[in-house]
């Protein structure tokens, strides 16, 4: 059974491990292996958004809800991360820094129950290819909101400082489409 506070406590305890990243990956994998339990604890997603479950200078735990067909442009985290999907699908495109911006470096599709660890230098973009909300637990080895990061223009791949407000607008635009689709029915 997934209990939010126990999950948070387990992740905090994992920070004491020699390889905290690997320890957190195991905790996330165990949790998303029972997606209905996570849904029961965190609630059925109705809208896109980012819910902060825990935040400190060493650890951030988010419930990330990607709206239908939502795309978030290339960005980095500058800390390790573990992503676990408990509903839907997340397509990650990976990039490398180049002299003229980014170059493509592969992709990985995550489905319900899938988990992926991301190193602190990873640059990726995220797409929810489905017509439904994708739900994921994201755990970061630091303060996700206070760490200076970068984003890249999705067309030119030119680097710029990460704009949290712009990222949140992407979620809000997705919610506007969701609401419009609800009124069309």
Language-model features, listed with the residues they occupy:
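N-terminal leader/capping segments at the start of a protein or of a new domain
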Residues: 1-37
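A short glycine-rich, His/Asp/Glu-containing loop-to-beta-strand
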Residues: 39-70
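A short beta-loop-beta micro-motif enriched in histidine and acidic residues
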Residues: 55-59, 68-82, 103
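Short beta-strand His + acidic residue motifs that chelate non-heme Fe in jelly-roll/DSBH
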Residues: 73-74, 92-93, 118, 124-130, ...
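Glycine- and acidic-residue-biased ligand/ion/polar-headgroup-sensing regions
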Residues: 77-97
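Short acidic-glycine-tyrosine-enriched beta hairpin
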Residues: 97-124
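Double-stranded beta-helix
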Residues: 131-182
């Amino acid at each position: 059974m997934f209990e939010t506070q126990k999950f948070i406590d387990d992740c905090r305890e994992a920070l004491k491990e020699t390889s905290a990243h690997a320890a957190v990956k195991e905790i996330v994998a165990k949790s998303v292996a029972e997606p209905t339990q996570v849904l029961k604890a965190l609630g059925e997603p109705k809208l896109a958004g980012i819910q902060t479950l825990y935040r400190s200078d060493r650890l951030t735990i988010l419930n990330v809800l990607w709206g239908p067909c939502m795309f978030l442009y290339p960005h980095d985290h500058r800390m390790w991360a573990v992503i676990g999907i408990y509903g839907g699908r997340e397509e990650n495109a990976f990039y490398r820094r180049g002299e003229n911006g980014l170059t493509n470096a592969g992709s990985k599709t995550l489905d319900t129950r899938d988990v992926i660890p991301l190193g602190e230098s990873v640059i990726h973009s995220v797409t929810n290819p489905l017509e439904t909300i994708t739900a994921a637990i994201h755990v970061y080895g630091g303060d996700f909101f206070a760490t200076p990061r970068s984003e890249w223009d999705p067309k030119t791949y030119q680097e710029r400082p990460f704009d949290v407000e712009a990222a949140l607008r992407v979620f809000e635009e997705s919610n506007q489409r969701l609401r419009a689709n609800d009124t069309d029915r």
